[in-house]
């Protein structure tokens, strides 16, 4: 690999136009130019996350230290207690991190990666094993496809109170307002690259590698998404280059929620986030509390308790929400070779659903609710255990078992009837992965093989009463649905990561074999099917420099035949899964000052099924094509002029052309709920203990139906959805270690109170849904 060359300010400015992530700058209150870096000073800093340590050192020394969150993520510093020069203190904090501090003049410093030897000259061969891993900056940079990781510090800086708000800001991802039967905070709606966002059914969604959907094969939807952003350290979105390792619903990529890590030293961390929308129907604060308690002993045994709880409603009437999410994690590493880990989760919540509004009701009061009966509740229990064996640097074995039990239920006004729909799901899984590294001539290989077995069972019921009776149904009411589903699925993969010169090439294939059935106990009938999918892939990276690479990939991906779609597939006489072929080409640059990425993609998606909740039917949309460009950039302006120290800017943009390609009246139309243009832009400023953030996001218009209906219907379910742009602002103060790292923040979302909306088209509670109005929020966090 060729040596790294520092780019001039002019070169970086040119790259700004075409190729992203925020840069943090720790700054002291004194003028940096007046600081003597060779003078010895007493420093006392605890062992803590590297980002916090650099912030505290910068404040004590009165210097500027610029770095990106990715550089410090998942890294800790040793404690300092004594007299050091600034150079010595920086070296001590960065020991073992793979980073070094470079003086840039006027007392300012930036962090840069230590030089990496040419792979051909490396003596040690180290396997990666799990591609998702801890989503470190190095993992992301070396990934052969589009991938973004949003870390806890970033979504706190954005004022994000939900997973939807975090996902909505990632290039190529659309996470619309809660709507339809997912119009509550327990659900999650998002789509990647123009795929329908309804209940996130087109992507593989994981939490620490464990499937999040209550039935990942038979019902891969997130009407109950047991993931609280307060319990997460990062959100890892792999839009391309991951379908060989992860599935099944991988047409829309892989999203992995990374839970908060077990601290190395015993720690207690508390934080709170409260919101209020004064101009809406909200009658009180909506508040989320988060807690982490845990640590690791000298014997390698560690544990942590995570809790996130939400109470309150949002800007719509009839939106009260209660969520309790408790996670217990444990890890025992008696030696470098052996590591054991386990996790349990209990998630329980309930929420009123405000529902959609007709056009007339929306004009009268967009914050009202006309559906007093709609309500959703659910709970999930998860248990997982994992064993990792690493006998040497070139071998790694991981075995993970998991079990989930889920209940999701709710009342829904379906016009003539009020319904109660309790549904239970049980999932058992066992996954084994093995990686072996070896050398062959001038090339280095890491061969990975894996197998996952999943067994699912479901029981879905629906009870009803007449709507004009005004009585809610119970389990003693008449029922019109009683089905039991089951699935056995085996997935196998093999790939070979080959490093030769500046190239990294990874061919691989995933094979899925699925046996699924659904029994209708009311009709005494059964629909069943056996099918399989072979998904070959080829990924490649070319390293121009240690800071700049090119990547390309092509991969097969697929979506399962869900329980609700099995009857339609059997009737057609051809039980085939949804299939897609994805192509990507892009470039990524990251030198610690400038982060930039530019990529293009093409997805040809065939044999799609589409469910309509209003008519309780399944139709075939058939073929769609998704093509576009994604770009992101972040830049530390101190690189242009020291007077701009503390400022960084960022932007992202996605152009997505998603069109229906199936022959018929809708051929050539835009896929519903996909915007052609979407992006973000903003700036951060840090001075001393103060931090300020200004952020904007925008998207262009969408359609709600396949016909691309322009005019608005009376019920509000169809018609063009207008584009919008909103701005947010935030300010925080860090009181430092003398007050247990107390941080206080105040922010406002939708700063200019822009009115925007979305629609629900094929749900029973269809109609118009108003967007979040101007909302004030406060944040506080403290650690012990």
Which role does the model predict for each range below?
Residues 291-293, 386-390, 396-412, 543, ...:
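Membrane-embedded beta-barrel scaffold of Gram-negative outer-membrane proteins
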Residues 294-296, 447, 552, 638, ...:
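Conserved C-terminal beta-signal and adjacent last beta-strands/turns
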Residues 333-347, 377-521:
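Face-selective signature of the C-terminal outer-membrane beta-barrel domain
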Residues 282-311, 315-353, 375-388, 441, ...:
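Transmembrane beta-barrel wall of Gram-negative outer-membrane proteins
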Residues 434-436, 440-441, 447, 505, ...:
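Gram-negative outer-membrane beta-barrel transporters
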Residues 54, 112-156, 164, 390:
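Short, acidic, small-residue-rich periplasmic hinge/interaction motif at the N-terminus
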Residues 112, 139, 144, 164, ...:
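Extracytoplasmic beta-strand/coil segments of soluble accessory domains associated
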Residues 210-239:
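Short acidic/polar hinge/loop motifs at secondary-structure boundaries
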């Amino acid at each position: 690999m060729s040596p790294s060359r520092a780019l001039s300010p002019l070169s970086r400015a040119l790259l700004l136009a075409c190729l992203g992530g925020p840069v943090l700058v720790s700054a002291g209150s004194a003028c940096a130019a007046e600081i003597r870096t060779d003078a010895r000073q007493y420093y006392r800093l605890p062992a803590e996350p590297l980002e916090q340590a650099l912030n505290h050192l910068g404040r004590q020394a009165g210097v500027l230290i610029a770095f990106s969150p990715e550089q410090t993520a998942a890294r800790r510093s040793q404690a300092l207690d004594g007299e050091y020069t600034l150079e010595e203190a920086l070296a001590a904090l960065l020991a073992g991190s793979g980073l070094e501090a470079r003086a840039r003049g006027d007392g300012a410093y930036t962090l840069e990666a230590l030089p990496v030897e040419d792979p051909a000259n490396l003596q040690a061969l180290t396997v990666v094993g799990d591609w998702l891993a801890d989503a470190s900056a190095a993992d992301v940079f070396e990934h052969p496809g589009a991938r973004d990781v949003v870390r806890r510090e970033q979504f706190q800086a954005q004022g994000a109170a939900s997973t939807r708000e975090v996902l909505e800001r990632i290039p190529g991802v659309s996470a619309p307002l809660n709507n339809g039967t997912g119009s509550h905070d327990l659900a999650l709606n998002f789509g990647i690259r123009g795929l329908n966002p309804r209940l996130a059914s087109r992507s593989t969604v994981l939490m620490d590698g464990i499937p999040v959907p209550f039935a990942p094969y038979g019902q891969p939807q997130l009407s109950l998404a047991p993931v609280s952003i307060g319990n997460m350290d990062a959100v890892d979105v792999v839009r391309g280059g991951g379908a060989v390792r992860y599935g099944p619903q991988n047409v829309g990529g892989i999203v992995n929620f990374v839970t908060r890590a077990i601290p190395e030293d015993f720690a207690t961390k508390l934080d709170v986030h409260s919101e209020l929308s004064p101009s809406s129907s909200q009658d009180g604060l909506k508040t989320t509390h988060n807690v982490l308690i845990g640590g690791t002993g000298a014997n390698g045994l560690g544990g942590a308790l995570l809790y996130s709880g939400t109470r309150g409603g949002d800007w719509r009437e009839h939106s009260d929400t209660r969520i309790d999410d408790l996670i217990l994690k444990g890890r025992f590493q008696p030696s470098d070779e052996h590591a054991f880990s386990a996790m349990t989760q209990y998630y329980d919540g309930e929420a009123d659903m405000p529902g959609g509004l007709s056009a007339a009701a929306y004009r009268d009061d967009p914050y009202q609710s006309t559906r007093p009966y709609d309500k959703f509740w659910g709970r999930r229990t998860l248990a997982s255990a994992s064993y990792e064996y690493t006998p040497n640097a070139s071998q790694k074995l991981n075995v993970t078992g998991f079990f989930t039990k889920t209940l999701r239920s709710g009342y829904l006004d379906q016009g003539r009837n009020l319904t109660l729909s309790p549904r239970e799901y049980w999932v058992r899984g066992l996954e084994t992965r093995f990686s072996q590294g070896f050398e062959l001539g001038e090339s280095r290989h890491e061969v990975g093989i894996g197998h996952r077995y999943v067994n699912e069972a479901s029981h879905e019921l629906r009870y009803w009463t007449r709507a004009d009776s005004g009585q809610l149904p119970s389990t003693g009411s008449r029922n019109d649905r009683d089905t039991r589903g089951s699935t056995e699925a085996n997935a196998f993969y093999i790939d070979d990561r080959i490093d030769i010169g500046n190239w990294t090439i990874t061919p691989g294939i995933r094979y899925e074999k699925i046996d699924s059935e659904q029994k209708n106990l009311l009709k005494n009938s059964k629909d069943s099917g056996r099918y399989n999918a072979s998904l070959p892939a080829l990924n490649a990276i070319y390293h121009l420099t240690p800071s700049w690479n090119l990547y390309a990939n092509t991969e097969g991906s697929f979506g399962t035949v869900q329980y609700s779609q099995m009857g339609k597939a059997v009737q057609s006489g051809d039980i085939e899964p949804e299939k897609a072929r994805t192509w990507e080409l892009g470039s990524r640059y990251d030198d610690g000052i400038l982060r930039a990425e530019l990529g293009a993609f093409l997805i040809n998606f065939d044999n799609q099924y589409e469910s309509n909740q209003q008519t309780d039917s399944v139709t075939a949309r058939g073929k769609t094509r998704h093509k576009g460009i994604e770009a992101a950039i972040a830049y530390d302006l101190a690189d242009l002029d020291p007077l701009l120290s503390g400022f960084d800017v960022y932007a992202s943009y996605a152009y997505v052309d998603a069109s229906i390609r199936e022959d018929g009246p809708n051929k050539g139309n835009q896929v519903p709920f996909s915007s052609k243009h979407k992006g973000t832009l903003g700036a951060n400023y840090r001075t001393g203990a103060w931090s300020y953030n200004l952020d904007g996001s925008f998207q262009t218009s969408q359609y709600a139906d396949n016909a691309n209906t322009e005019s608005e219907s009376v019920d509000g379910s169809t018609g063009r959805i207008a584009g919008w742009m909103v701005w947010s602002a935030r300010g925080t103060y860090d009181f430092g270690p003398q007050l247990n790292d107390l941080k206080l923040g105040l922010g406002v979302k939708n700063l200019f109170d822009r009115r925007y909306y979305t629609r629900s088209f094929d749900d029973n509670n269809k109609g118009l849904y108003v967007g979040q109005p101007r909302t004030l929020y406060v944040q506080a966090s403290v650690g012990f």
